[in-house]
């Protein structure tokens, strides 16, 4: 019988029957925990109950998470048939439909705003909370990444199911805004509640990275590996482990992780490809010979090139193509983003993305002075392309290396000093890039 049920967290859910609700809940919980098969779960939910409208919208969300042209097209195919049904939708379904529709249309800001309205409608809508934070992450809107969780914290007492997920989300927001002590407290509270909370583990890994507590980071991820290694987010966690080894100049260990859990499966998902490109780029900055790895990664990257959708991805593709010497593909990405980017991505590309693409391409080609000009101008607004502070740290590292290789020793030393002051425990990586330590 059609009607309104509630999901696992007590939020109303418009359904055609009871059959799909548990499967829908499993899909949302899988997204929150970063474990399991969320796509399979939501497909099973709508197969059991085609009237589960939010299930169809979640299918679209999962396609959009791919941050690719193919993902957008798949989402549009799911969302378009729902337009005629809008008059019969509940408030929650309407707000989520608007969010997914805006995201698919390229208006990522409006998508986030619709999810904020969904949280005003019901502050315990965990689906809205998770996707809103992820969108703010994609948008580089660091303050909103934290505040969207702050506003609903009081709605989540410790005894309520889902509390641990909310603590993990809040921990990551605190970390990205530089409140490392509070981030660690909330992350550890979440992990005490649920040791398999991958987002909380991720937040704590970021704290260790940003504070230069490398030994603690290695120990934490090693001791907790059984809790996160089966996650579909595991490649990114292994990337953090590799960064710790890189900070300690343990290049063989970092390469071993690259060859093992990071690239063994040769995933063609952007979330995995960007980690691979970033790691190889950083290793090369340190003068490490990565062999044929860059050529192999470039082949994989070339397979997923599509209409420009998220310039953060294309920036990392430039890293891979630059290392492999594929100037034609670098130029294609620059041209495509200038001519065909739309919506939020077009604005972000104009503000910072194009400068990052050209700056990294220039560095790869040995045009270090041009790289200096571009990266110096863009570094203060690079956050708009999205990603975390740890991911965007590669901008400063590349600028230091460019200054060093261009013979701008004074600039290089000042940049290293600035980075060391900002991250006292992580000064070694910058220092190695000074003249004589990198080639």
Map each language-model feature to its residues.
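Intrinsically disordered, charged and Pro/Gly-enriched terminal/linker segments
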Residues: 5-22, 84-96, 101-102, 409-412, ...
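Generic helix N-cap/helix-start motif at coil->alpha-helix transitions
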Residues: 18-23, 51-53, 89-95, 122-129, ...
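Residue-level signature for tetratricopeptide repeat
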Residues: 29-30, 62, 101-102, 135, ...
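Alpha-helical repeat scaffolds
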Residues: 41-44, 72-86, 109-119, 143-156, ...
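Canonical tetratricopeptide repeat
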Residues: 58, 131, 169, 203, ...
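Internal metal/ion-chelating core segments
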Residues: 148-248
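Helix-coil-helix junctions within alpha-helical repeat/solenoid scaffolds
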Residues: 242-439
């Amino acid at each position: 019988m059609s009607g309104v049920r509630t999901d696992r967290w007590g939020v109303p859910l418009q359904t055609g029957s009871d059959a799909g609700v548990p499967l829908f809940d499993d899909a949302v919980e899988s997204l929150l925990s970063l474990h399991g098969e969320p796509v399979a779960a939501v497909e099973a939910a709508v197969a059991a109950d085609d009237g589960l409208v939010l299930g169809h919208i979640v299918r679209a969300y999962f396609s959009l998470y791919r941050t690719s042209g193919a993902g957008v097209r798949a989402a549009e195919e799911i969302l378009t048939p729902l337009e005629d049904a809008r008059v019969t939708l509940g408030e929650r379904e309407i707000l989520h439909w608007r969010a997914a529709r805006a995201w698919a249309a390229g208006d990522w800001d409006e998508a986030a705003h619709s999810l904020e309205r969904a949280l005003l409608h019901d502050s315990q809508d965990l689906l809205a909370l998770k996707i809103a934070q992820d969108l703010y992450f994609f948008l580089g809107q660091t303050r909103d990444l934290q505040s969207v969780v702050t506003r609903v914290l009081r709605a989540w007492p410790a005894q309520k199911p889902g509390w641990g997920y909310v603590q993990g989300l809040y921990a990551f927001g605190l970390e990205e805004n530089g409140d490392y002590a509070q981030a660690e407290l909330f992350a550890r509270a979440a992990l005490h509640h649920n040791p398999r909370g991958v987002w909380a583990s991720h937040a704590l890994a970021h704290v260790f990275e940003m504070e230069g507590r490398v030994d603690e980071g290695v120990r934490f991820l090693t001791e907790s590996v059984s809790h996160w290694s089966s996650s579909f987010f595991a490649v990114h966690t292994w990337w953090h482990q590799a960064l710790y080894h890189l900070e300690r100049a343990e290049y063989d260990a970092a390469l071993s992780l690259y060859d093992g859990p990071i690239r063994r499966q040769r995933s063609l998902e952007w979330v995995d490809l960007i980690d691979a490109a970033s790691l190889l780029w950083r290793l090369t900055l340190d003068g490490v010979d990565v062999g044929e790895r860059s050529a192999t990664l470039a082949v994989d990257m070339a397979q997923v090139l599509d209409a420009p959708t998220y310039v953060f991805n294309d920036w990392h593709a430039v890293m891979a193509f630059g290392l492999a010497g594929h100037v034609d593909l670098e130029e294609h990405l620059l041209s495509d983003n200038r001519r065909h980017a739309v919506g939020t991505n077009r604005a972000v590309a104009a503000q910072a993305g194009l400068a990052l693409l050209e700056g990294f391409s220039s560095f790869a080609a040995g045009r270090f002075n041009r790289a200096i000009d571009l990266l110096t101008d863009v570094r203060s607004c690079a956050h708009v392309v999205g990603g975390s502070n740890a991911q965007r740290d590669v901008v400063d590292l590349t600028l230091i290396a460019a200054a060093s290789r261009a013979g701008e020793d004074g600039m290089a030393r000042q940049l290293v000093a600035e980075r060391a002051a900002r991250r006292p425990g992580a000064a070694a990586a910058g220092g190695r890039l000074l003249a004589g330590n990198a080639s």
